[in-house]
A protein has these predicted regions:
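Outer membrane beta-barrel strand-and-loop segments of large Gram-negative receptors
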Residues: 339, 351, 359, 402-408, ...
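Periplasmic N-terminal accessory/gating domains of Gram-negative outer-membrane beta-barrel systems
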Residues: 1-30, 45-79, 86
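Gram-negative outer-membrane beta-barrel transporters
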Residues: 565-572, 591-681
Length: 726
């Protein structure tokens, strides 16, 4: 209901309206000042992996509202869930047929003010984003000496480096959903299917990327314009069948594809004072297939039994990333930049991950409201990453460059065949890794009412976890890093109901933060020359978190839309994992280290009220204090005292909604939504390099939906009205 009222189109837009939650760059979730690694996402209660190796969480905007029944966000830990979260557990429940047959279709059209009907640049591309570009696999698999001969006989690349200009047209999208019930054998068979497609065009003009040391010295800087084309596809199928009166079994299939193609035009100066101009093209294709089966069975009035299992296959492909760099001469002319062979290149990267989950749990009821829960869970995750680079050796090649956009008159296959350009295929053991994780878990939990208005929930979870990464050093030596742990995770949750309107909650728990695969793997990744590099740390260890919450809430009995809550929380972080920033070769290098301890504490306030008929307002805000104590031998850190990486000191959400109903049941829903995220540290500086910070960000959105009848409605959505420079 809230998603409909506020015009929310996907899960990410809904989650970021919740108290204490914000979305950082690249869709990373920040909860109570804790970054992506401190939260977890499940689909219908089962873990779901992220296809993006940079993030632990699956991008939440991959789930369109048309496929979602509800979103449950829990910021306190319960023993029935995996223990690897201290921020939030976000469970996305996909739609099920509620017994009412329906079919609906929706279409949308839109665009961004600074993009629509403006010039839009893109590098040469063979297929649309519905298909994956690629390279003949035999050019990846063959021996190096064979490749050097084969490339002179056949061009393995289907694209060139030309940049084309067009006019940005409106964005189009659509969704379709339907459901139907049948009576089979005296039971109900339900089928639901939904899908959505959307595309987005976005431009960023006159942006600046600069690397500074703590003393203020500029190592390099680049101005750039960015042109991004993005496609999102999602599909859901759900088949359910009832057994007996209260039993049921079901199967759910979810598919999502997020594909983006970004062209960057960059100008600037590197660390060695070369004045440069660059064309970069980056394509990311993330796909997810998730299969789930589940069953629910009741045995008498006291016992019930749940079983479920899932298989997820995620793929992350970065096909044919291209970079072409020019150096500006004093007379303004251009020549190919040839500092080393890495300035002009192509890159192909593929990540494949498979995850299996099995879950069994049972509940025994005694008394009027008391319960005992028992359960066991198994999870196995396997990842494989491979990458190949093709460097263009341009030494001795001096073409006449008159147009930096159209380059196929000299960057062509003919010049490869005649020897003016030499292609070097680079495949090294250090540019690939394998990783895996296995968890065996069991839990017990009791919900007991010593008196009618006081709930005591006490749980204990045991997890045996093994996480490993196989990688290679720069010298090609095979290495294996393993984290093997046996842990107990207690959880205490108390609720005292003062009366029908007021209640108080208290929670305490211990949880774990495990490093992600990419954080553990010493694999160097860089999207563009002079841009930030990412390099994992094989020495990372698990971090542990001690969490405490105290919450008061009031819901008016005669109108639950009117509510007020205030929450105080504190977290002690033992060995928290921090994203650090160093420099190498003039470029920033982001890596990861365990700090000694950290603290996160804050106050959250939420207020919702129906001011008068059909007119509602809501405000929620958070004030957060975070601090990291660095190891005594951690002298590499530039600043000895600072807040947690990714934490904003304050967050505010506010909304006003007007929803009158007119004659013939026509209805208007109009909402104005405001959000501010305070400044935050993106990456921690070490070895004299300063912390990388993001300033406060303000956004204002307007959404209007007009329901003409039960079968037809119109929606207008305007986002980021403030258009703040970032």
């Amino acid at each position: 209901k809230e998603m409909t009222l506020k015009g929310i189109s996907n899960v990410q837009e809904g989650v970021k309206k919740i108290t204490g939650i914000s979305i950082a760059s690249a869709g990373q979730l920040i909860v109570r000042g804790l970054g992506d690694r401190y939260s977890t996402t499940t689909l219908n209660g089962l873990p779901i992996a992220s296809p993006n190796p940079d993030n632990k969480l699956i991008p939440l905007d991959i789930f369109p509202a048309a496929t979602v029944q509800n979103i449950t966000v829990s910021k306190v830990y319960e023993a029935g869930a995996f223990a690897d979260y201290s921020g939030a557990h976000i469970d996305i429940s996909t739609k099920e047929n509620t017994g009412v047959d329906f079919f609906n279709v929706g279409f949308n059209v839109g665009g961004q003010f600074n993009t629509l009907f403006q010039d839009f640049y893109s590098m040469d591309r063979v297929h649309s984003l519905f298909r994956n570009p690629g390279i003949d696999q035999k050019f990846i698999d063959m021996e190096r000496t064979e490749f050097e001969s084969a490339i002179l006989q056949k061009n393995p690349f289907k694209t060139n480096f030309d940049v084309k200009k067009k006019t940005a047209l409106p964005e189009f999208g659509g969704s379709m959903a339907g459901a139907k019930d049948w009576q089979v054998g005296g039971q109900t068979l339900s089928l639901l299917a939904a899908m959505s497609v959307s595309n987005d065009l976005a431009t960023i003009q006159n942006a600046l990327y600069r690397t500074l040391e703590a003393g203020g010295h500029t190592l390099d800087y680049f101005n750039y314009d960015s042109y991004k084309n993005e496609l999102k596809i999602a599909g859901l199928g759900n088949l359910a069948y009832t057994l007996r009166q209260n039993d049921r079994i079901g199967y759910t299939f979810f598919y999502a594809r997020n594909a983006s193609d970004t062209y960057l035009r960059r100008e600037g100066i590197d660390e060695e004072d070369h004045e440069l101009l660059g064309n970069n093209n980056i394509t990311h294709i993330y796909t997810l297939q998730n299969h789930q089966i589940n069953g629910y069975h009741e045995f008498g009035s006291q016992w019930d039994f749940n079983w479920s299992g899932s298989y997820s296959k995620t793929q992350s492909s970065e096909p044919d990333r291209r970079q072409l760099m020019f150096e500006k001469n004093r007379d303004g002319s251009l020549e190919l930049f040839k500092l080393n062979r890495q300035e002009t290149m192509r890159y192909f990267g593929d990540l494949n991950e498979d995850e299996w989950v099995g879950d069994l749990r049972s509940t025994y009821r005694f008394g009027s409201k008391n319960k005992v829960k028992l359960g066991a869970t198994y999870k196995d995750k396997q990842r494989e990453f491979r990458s190949t680079r093709f460097y263009y050796n341009l030494q001795g090649f001096y073409p006449d460059i008159t147009d930096s956009y159209i380059t196929s008159n000299f960057m062509n296959y003919g010049n490869i065949q005649n020897g003016d350009i030499r292609i070097i295929r680079d495949q090294q053991p250090k540019d690939q890794y394998d990783a895996g994780q296995t968890i065996y878990a069991g839990f017990t939990e009791i919900e007991y009412y010593p008196v009618n208005n006081f709930l005591v929930s006490l749980g204990l979870r045991y997890e045996h976890s093994k996480q490993w990464v196989n990688y290679a050093t720069y010298g090609g030596q095979a290495q294996r890093n393993v984290l093997n742990n046996n842990d107990l995770f207690p959880a205490l949750n108390l609720k005292y109901t003062v009366n029908d309107e007021n209640s108080v909650r208290f929670s305490f728990s211990r949880t774990v933060t495990r490093p992600s695969f990419i954080e553990m793997a010493p694999f160097l990744y860089q999207e563009s020359y002079g841009g930030a590099q990412i390099f994992g740390n094989a020495e990372l260890e698990n971090g542990y978190n001690y969490n405490i919450d105290l919450r008061y809430e009031r819901f008016e009995a005669d109108n639950p839309n009117n509510m007020f809550s205030i929450t105080g929380y504190g977290k002690i972080l033992d060995s928290p994992i921090e994203r650090t920033q160093d420099t190498s070769g003039g470029a920033a290098v982001h890596s990861f280290q365990n700090a000694k301890t950290g603290i996160a504490a804050g106050i959250e306030i939420e207020f919702r009220r129906e001011l008068f008929r059909n007119f509602r307002m809501g405000v929620n805000g958070s004030y957060m204090y975070t601090n990291v104590k660095l190891p005594e031998d951690g002298g590499a850190y530039t600043n000895s005292q600072r807040s947690l990486q990714g934490a904003s000191p304050y967050l505010i959400n506010a909304d006003i909604s007007y929803s009158p109903t007119f004659k013939n049941q026509t209805q208007l829903i109009a909402s104005l939504l405001y959000n501010v995220q305070g400044p935050r540290i993106h990456a921690v500086g070490i070895n004299g390099l300063g912390d990388e910070k993001q300033d406060a960000v303000h956004t204002l959105d307007f959404v209007a939906n007009y329901k003409i009848n039960d079968n037809f409605s119109l929606k207008l959505q305007v986002t980021d009205l403030l258009n703040q420079d970032i």
